[in-house]
């Protein structure tokens, strides 16, 4: 592609096998791309939502990552990214506390481009422990952003854990897997959603998160038939807390039961 929207992408990686159980990986990434059209040009019947940002520069991202994959110790990876000309939506400076209190933030959202470099570090560890018919699958994620202005918000710590039991039952006529999912992330300034733009925008007024999400599940397989039953967000009925949010002003779903059946027909 050529012209104002031209960009470039470079990816390279290397893998070194230490032995049968352990592997080292490394990768670099470099990209330059124009912001999406919503940032550059937007037209609507609403007076406040018409702009043309011809002065926006290409967003530059340089990344380096390393990984250690072990069948015994688990998988550990780290990635560092430096982002220049980071493009984002947020509210303008003329918004008042009264506007925020009245829930009128959406009327002040505009596209912006950060002039300082945003440094983003991500470290992830994955490991599954197994004992007889029990397994515990774990994913831990640590994130840190170094920035002069708070334009990129992420939770500092995220964990996802699944404890499950797997076994053949009824003289091996059925295979069953049942357990519990646990998800959690630390509180942070969760991006808000703008329905007119169809985009998320940065907000630094209110933190969300720091609550667990518990799901119970049962999966079963009988020949070509698969069945699942899932109780999602179980902890919402176990506590009196009712302020779970998926985004500002968008409540997270309540407790729900989901049932499914997959039956494959063979000729």
Show the residue positions of the predicted features:
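Exposed, low-structure sequence patches enriched in small/polar residues
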Residues: 1-267
